Amino acid sequence: LQEDEEVKARRPRWRRWWMGCLGVVGGLVALVLLAALAGVVLWHTGRVSLWFAEKQSAKTEGVAPADRPWPPLGTPAGEEPEDRWPGPSLDASRVGDRAAFFVRTNVWRVDLAFSEDEWRALQPTGHKPSVDFNAPDGKFPLRNDAAPRNGLAGVMGLGQPWSKGRVTVGGVAFDGVSVRLKGNGTFLNSFTALKKPFKVDLGRGHPGRALAGSAVLNLNNLVSDFSSMSDAMGYRMYREAGVPAPRTAYARVRLGLGERYRRRPLGLYVLVENLDEGWLAEWFRGRDAALFKPVTYELFKDLGTNWSAYEGIYDPKVRVSDAHKARLMEAARFVTGSTDAEFGARVAEFFDLEEVARFVAVTSAIASYDGFLFNGQNFMMYLDGPRGRFGLVPWDLDQAWGEFPLVGTVRERERASIERPWVADHRLLERLFGVESFRRVYRAEMERIVREWFVPARLRAEVRELAAWVRPTVLEESDYRRGRFEEAVKETWDADGPEPRIDDPFRPVHSMHRFIVRRHESLEAQLAGREKGVVFEKRMPFGK
C-alpha cells in the first residue's frame, strides 16, 4: 500500500491533474446521460405533457382571482349561495324530446357528484406526445398514434379516461353515470381548474338510458368565450340557414366532491346537443346516413382501398356500413385524382353542393376559423346514404364570430374575404371554388344569409336577450369572469388600438356588438363590389 502511494507521488503533477479532470468529466457525462434517460422515460410516459399542461393552465388561471371561499359540509342550507340564485327551476322529467330540452334560453340545473376516488380516476392520463409539434408551415399535428384521441390534447400526449359519478339534471338523478373530461383548447386552458369541460354518457353501461332522447350530454365550460353565447348564436345561425347543426341550452353546474364540497357552483356551461344516431334520424327523417368527425388538413385525400387507413382520420361517430366506407374511399379517389374537367362534371354526384355552399357561407359570414376553414378539425361530415353525397356540419363554435386569435387581427377577421374564405391552402375548397356552378350557388347563399339572417338589429337583440338569461349564473363566477362578460356584451366599444399579443390574457375582450356591426358592413361591401376582403395567405406557426 505504501509502495502504491510512493508510485502515485512520483507521477508528474500534470498527469495527476489530467486524471482528475477526466474523472470530473466522466461524472458529468454520466449525470447528463442519466438526465437524458430520465427525460426519455418521462417523455414516453407522458409526464412531460402533464407537467407542461399544468404550467400553461396555471398561467391562464392566474389571471383570475382565486375562487370564492365555499361553505363546508354542514353549513345551513339557507346560507348556501345556490339558494339565492334567481335562475329558473326547470323540471327535466316533464321534457319529452330533444327539441324541448335544447332551447337556447333554457338554463338547466346540473349537479355532478364524485367520490375522491372517482374524481382521481377522471384526471388526465399521460402518453407519448407527438415529436413534430410545431411545423414551420403552421400545420401543427392533428393526430398522435400513441394517444387515445385526436386533436391538440392527443398530440400533447394527454388522455381523458372515463370515470363514474352521480348526475342530476333538472331534478332527474342518475347513478353510476360514465363521465370524462372533453375538448382540446378548453380542456388545456382549464387543466388545473375545477370548472372543467365534461362529457356525460348516461347510456354507457346502461343501454337505453337517456334524458329527453339524449344519452350523451356535452357540458362545455366556456373558458375561451367571455360572451358565453358564441356557440348558442352560431349554431342557431346555421340551423336557420338550413345547415344540419346541433341545438344548445345552458347549464348552471354544481360540483359535489367527496367530503370537500356538497354543491359548489362551477358557473355557466353551454349544453351542446350530441351528434349521434338520434340526431341523424331526426335531421334525415330516418333514412340511411353516416356521420364522421374528420381530423386532417387533406380532406378526401386518396389513401388507398384499405379502410384502416381512413378510420382513425375520419373517426366515425355512428356505426358505418361497408357501403358507407366504400363511398368515402371512392370520393377520396375522385377528389384526389380527377382532372378539373372531370371534377366539375361529376362533383354533384359526391357532394350536396347547396348544403356545402350554405355551410361555407355561414362559416365565412361569422368568421369561424377554429375549424374547417383553417385547421382541419372541429367540424363533422355526413353521408346521405341513398343519395351517396357528403355534406358538412359545424362543431365547436366557442371562438366563432371573429374571435379566434390565431388567424389575422380582429380588424382583419371583421373584413375577411368571402370570395376566398379559407386560410392558406385548402385542396377541397380550392377545387370546389374552381367550379362555376358551385361559386354561383355559394354567392346566392351568402346573399340570402346577409339579407335574412346576418342582420345587425336582429343579432344585437339576440345578444341582449341571451345576456339577460345567463347573467345570473355568470355573476356567481370570479370578478375577472364577470368583468370580461360585461365587456364582451356591452353595446359600445373602444376605438381601434394596437393589436395585442394573442397570448396576452389581458388583451381587450372581443366585442360581440362590434363584430356584428363591422362584419355586416364588410359583407355588404364585398357583395356590392366595393371591397375585396382580407385573404389569409399563410398560417401562423403554432405557438408564435
Question: Where in this protein do the model-derived segments appear?
Answer:
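Juxtamembrane low-complexity tails/linkers enriched in Ser/Thr-Pro and polybasic
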Residues: 2-15
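N-terminal Sec-pathway targeting helices
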Residues: 12-33
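Short hydrophobic alpha-helical membrane-anchoring segments
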Residues: 32-44, 367-368
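Middle-to-C-terminal accessory/interaction subdomains
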Residues: 86-90, 99-100, 105-108, 118-127, ...
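Short beta-strand micro-motifs enriched in acidic
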Residues: 182, 256, 382-384
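Short, His- and charge-rich active-site/binding loops that engage polyanionic ligands
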Residues: 184-186, 190, 284-298, 397, ...
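Internal "kinase-insert"/substrate-recognition segments embedded within catalytic cores
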Residues: 197-207, 211-216, 220-223, 227-228, ...
